[in-house]
Structures are given as structure tokens and as C-alpha cells.
Design a protein with these regions (language model features):
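An N-terminal assembly and electron-transfer interface module characteristic of large anaerobic redox
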Residues: 1-293
Length: 293
């Protein structure tokens, strides 16, 4: 990344663009039949400009023929070659819910499991099972997710464990660095090697945060009422699914954080909900949630 992107550019951009270039340099791909896809938040964060930095880096690296498509919900890069459809968006949301639940349960079981690797094997089992279901065009409706959540929780609860006191460490931060072992120097592996239980707040919280901010902009600055109504309706649907996931988690004897609608209330009086560059008020909210939880 540093070879083709200015070093003053934010850390995640250097890593993400570096990963793209590393893949192209690997020799594993037919470069005349390869395209890149990168997300754009559409907010004030420089992440909205990663796509332009990536295109410049490709030219400098000798890959001007490789197109870059944008994945965003803000109307940016409308002609980039990739369009998010409603069916695809519903599947993506389902994958995020399932992924959050698997990660949360795995992290609460792995430090205490009697048989090393049992929690990771259970994750692999459910990833394979859910993959088959989703590829068959099923498993992504609210009804299907609400049916599946208790089954996942039940399987993890059945893993034999020995509960002993351990240090619990919550991790918050910039969205890429928080989850990427490359970005955070494999923080989770290190903490687990120190006999800690690690808690990473889920990705769905960030998704809801982005949606909420679109509606909050209407409250703070005006604009189209339809946007506010649309985001409220979408958040209500996500809240319904999220509460079912959290209930299944708690019913199986695991720790479940509060839903997003409760998370929004936690930073009030500490930081404005209009502070939304990067992860903004979400960082404060997640820290409060982890401390109180």
C-alpha cells in the first residue's frame, strides 16, 4: 500500500489497497478477466475516496485495465458496473446476522471448551450449512432467520465447557481495523493466548449505525422526509430480527448485548448523535455497552 498510496492516507486505505495489489501480483488471477469491488460509505470519512485512491494505485502499479466497482447505498459511482439489488441486499443482511451470532457464540465458548477447537469446528459446520441454504435461495427471510437462531445457539450451548474466571476484553474501533487480523496485528489471537475472553461488537451494529445516520441527517439538517421514513422502517425490520437473535443467544445461557435501539440511547449527554465521521458516536456507545454488560 505504501508503495502506491501517500503515507498520510489513513491506515485502513493503505492496507486494503495493499491487499488488492498483493492479490493481483500473486499470479493467481487472469488479469484481463479480473475486476475489483470496494465498499464506499458515502459519509465524510476518507473511506468514501478509497475507490479513487485504488484506481490511481492500479495505474501506477501497471494495471490500468482492471476495473473497480463500488458497493454503496449512497448513490455514488452509479456507473461503476455493480448494482446492489434488493434480493442480494437481503441475503447480505442475513449473512451479517448469522456471522455476528457465530462470532459472538464462538468467542464465549472457545476460552472455556474442554476439547480444544470444538467451537471453531462448530463455526465451520454452521458456515457450511448456512452456505448451502443461502445458495439454494433460502434462509434469508426474517421468519427463516428467527427459526435458525435458536438452532445455532443450542448447538454451541451443547459444547462441553469448564467455566472458570477469565479476564474479559471488549474491542471497539475503526470498522476494518477492528475485525481484520492484518489491521490489528492479530489482536484476538494475542488476547486469547493470554487466556482472555474477547468480545467484538457485531457488524450489524455498524450497518444500523450507517442507516440511522441517514435519518438523523434529516433531523439535524432537513431534507427529504421520505429518507427519514424509509430508514425508520428499515431499522424497525432489522430490530425485529436482531431481538430474535439476541433472545436466542440469551435463552441458551450466553451474554447478549442490548439491541441497537437501546445502544443509540447510551451516548446521549456524552457525545452528539451528529458526530458520525468514521465510527463517531458508535465507539462511545459500544464502550458503554461493554462496560455495563
Amino acid at each position: 500500500g505504501l508503495k502506491y498510496v501517500h503515507n498520510d492516507t489513513c491506515y485502513p486505505a493503505l492496507l486494503v489497497i495493499g491487499q488488492f495489489l498483493d492479490a493481483l501480483n500473486s499470479g493467481k488471477y487472469d488479469l484481463d478477466h479480473t475486476a475489483l469491488l470496494i465498499t464506499q460509505t458515502g459519509g465524510g470519512c476518507r473511506a468514501s475516496n478509497y475507490i479513487h485512491l485504488l484506481r490511481k494505485a492500479l495505474v501506477k502499479a501497471g494495471y490500468p485495465q482492471i476495473p473497480v466497482a463500488s458497493l454503496n447505498f449512497s448513490g455514488l459511482e452509479k456507473d461503476s458496473g455493480f448494482q446492489m439489488t434488493l434480493p442480494l441486499a437481503r441475503r447480505a443482511l442475513a449473512c451479517i446476522f448469522y456471522g455476528d451470532m457465530l462470532c459472538a457464540l464462538r468467542n464465549q465458548v472457545a476460552p472455556y471448551e474442554n476439547e480444544k477447537g470444538a467451537a471453531d469446528r462448530m463455526v465451520d459446520l454452521w458456515v457450511e450449512r448456512l452456505g448451502r441454504v443461502l445458495l439454494a435461495g433460502k434462509g434469508f427471510t426474517a421468519r427463516e432467520m428467527k427459526h435458525t437462531f435458536p438452532l445455532i445457539a443450542k448447538d454451541f450451548a451443547a459444547i462441553p465447557v469448564t467455566r472458570v474466571p477469565k479476564v474479559k476484553v471488549g474491542v471497539v474501533g475503526e470498522i476494518y481495523v477492528k475485525y481484520s487480523p492484518l489491521g490489528n496485528n492479530d489482536l484476538q489471537k494475542f488476547l486469547e493466548s493470554q487466556d482472555c475472553e474477547v468480545n467484538f461488537p457485531g457488524l450489524m451494529g455498524f450497518v444500523q449505525y450507517c442507516i440511522f445516520n441517514m435519518g438523523e441527517d434529516h433531523v439535524l439538517y432537513g431534507g427529504k422526509l421520505a429518507v427519514k421514513m424509509g430508514t425508520d422502517q428499515l431499522l424497525n425490520w432489522l430490530d425485529s430480527v436482531e431481538r430474535a437473535m439476541l433472545k436466542a443467544t440469551a435463552d441458551a445461557g450466553f451474554y447478549a448485548p442490548g439491541p441497537f435501539k437501546e445502544l443509540v440511547e447510551k451516548p446521549r449527554g456524552i457525545i452528539s448523535l451528529g458526530a458520525k465521521m468514521g465510527e463517531g458516536w458508535l465507539l462511545t456507545a459500544e464502550m458503554i455497552e461493554l462496560v455495563q454488560g
